[in-house]
A protein has these predicted regions:
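PLP-dependent aminotransferase class I/II
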Residues: 62, 237-321
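Conserved PLP-binding catalytic core of the aspartate aminotransferase-like
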Residues: 155, 302-303, 314-346, 366, ...
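Active-site pre-lysine segment of PLP-dependent enzymes
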Residues: 163-171, 184-210, 214-247, 263
């Protein structure tokens, strides 16, 4: 199926239900990091920082992982292929976990490496990228740097990926990025909706690749949700990405992987950096994948703290999108920048701007219960009504 660049771009104009948001590139990603650094610089000296800005697991990895890391120091001088266990052992561990073949797996230095390589592998100047808005910015950032066309489809009224216009936009695309749960909105689509979406895209545009990113899979509590890994294994041009940065608490170790049919993910294998996972990360990942109890405990902990945080914000009149991650997308009724800076001045660092909702919404990661109780007190201080000169109550926040 041959689709020209002009044809791909024309589809954006002709789809009456599509809402296209200006693409965010590498410059925007760098600006996002600058926003986080700027907020942290406002934390007063001597105040213990509560960092709930980056969707990290506040407890870090479990004991089995820490023990595995400590045990690898004698092999720190070895390349990953010469260590025991090596990267092949990690691939085998993932294969065993999902009862699949090693050829169905590609390892990455975090799932971000895989996402970047997916844009390089599957998009071209003629066949662009389709993604949500807001959604994780990695893929559009790479596409913009490559000057490949991008269609960003605004989320629906429930802050979920808007599947109908995404299906229409996918015609002639090289890659569709389907973030499920979606970051930053934390919303999720059920298994049937995902399968229907993939089936429709396959019908409309058989050569288009669908990347289903399940970074927050382990936090989902919606009974309608299921991993798309079985779907990816039976369907050409579909693959799933996972990371150990979130529920496994290994954001600093940088381990991710892709799962799909061998012919689908082969281009990713060709693009990955040699020795892309360290000997420490390999050992840590193998230990983490074997520790199912730790993940169950982390899911339960996050669910309880998330419920507390939702209630605390709701009492302030701040509504959250239905969350199935370790973060919330919250309507604070004012620009995220103002809210972020006001919170930082009291020691709480929340998330960056997420266009097109940066004037009203903020992403708040879920910390420990103690952290979120303290953060809730700061939110009350920042968002509380203030008295006007005539004694009336104003809905404006107190930006202390």
């Amino acid at each position: 199926m041959s689709v020209s660049r002009r044809g791909f771009l024309r589809g954006r104009v002709l789809s009456c239900s599509e809402s296209v948001i200006a693409a965010r590139g590498m410059e925007a990603q760098q600006a996002d990091a600058a926003q986080d650094r700027s907020a942290r610089s406002l934390v007063p000296p001597g105040v213990t920082e509560i960092r709930i800005s980056s969707n990290e697991n506040p407890l870090g990895p479990g004991k089995a992982v820490l023990d595995a890391i400590l045990g690898k120091f004698p092999e720190a001088g070895r390349y990953p292929f010469n260590s025991t266990p090596n990267d092949g052992a990690l691939t085998s561990a993932i294969a065993s976990r999902f009862k699949i073949k090693p050829e169905n797996i590609v390892l990455g230095g975090g799932s971000q490496e895989i996402l970047k390589n997916a844009v390089r592998a599957y998009t071209t100047p003629a066949r662009g990228l389709v993604t949500g808005a807001p959604s994780f910015e990695n893929c559009p950032g790479v596409a913009k740097k490559l000057s490949h066309p991008i269609k960003e489809i605004k989320v629906d009224s429930l802050f979920r990926l808007d599947l109908e216009p995404m299906m229409d936009a996918a015609k002639g695309a090289g890659l569709v990025f389907f973030n499920n749960p979606n970051n930053p909105t934390a919303t999720v689509h059920g298994a049937q909706a995902v399968a229907d979406f993939v089936g429709r895209v396959r019908h409309l545009s058989p050569d288009t690749v669908v990347l289903i990113d399940e970074a927050y899979h382990d936090y989902v509590t919606d009974p309608a949700y299921e991993s798309a890994i079985p779907l990816a294994l039976e369907t050409p041009n579909v693959f799933v990405t996972r990371t150990l940065s979130k529920a496994y608490g290994m954001a600093g170790m940088r381990v991710g992987y892709a799962i799909g049919r061998a012919e689908t993910i082969k281009p990713l294998e060709k693009l990955k950096m040699p020795y892309n996972i360290s000997v420490f990360a390999i050992a840590a990942a193998i230990a983490a994948l074997s520790d199912a109890k730790h993940i169950e405990q982390e899911r339960d902990r996050n669910t309880k703290v998330r419920a507390f945080t939702i209630k605390a914000l709701d009492e302030l009149g701040c509504k959250s999108a239905v969350s199935h991650g370790n973060f919330l997308f919250v309507d604070v009724g004012r620009p995220a920048k103002q809210f972020r800076e006001a919170c930082a001045k009291q020691g709480v660092v929340v998330g960056r701007d997420f266009p097109p909702f940066e004037k009203t919404h903020v992403r708040i990661s879920i910390g420990t219960m103690d952290e979120m109780q303290k953060a809730a007190a700061v939110f009350r201080s920042v968002l509380r009504p203030v008295s006007t000169s005539d004694g009336a109550r104003s809905e404006e926040a107190s930006w202390r």
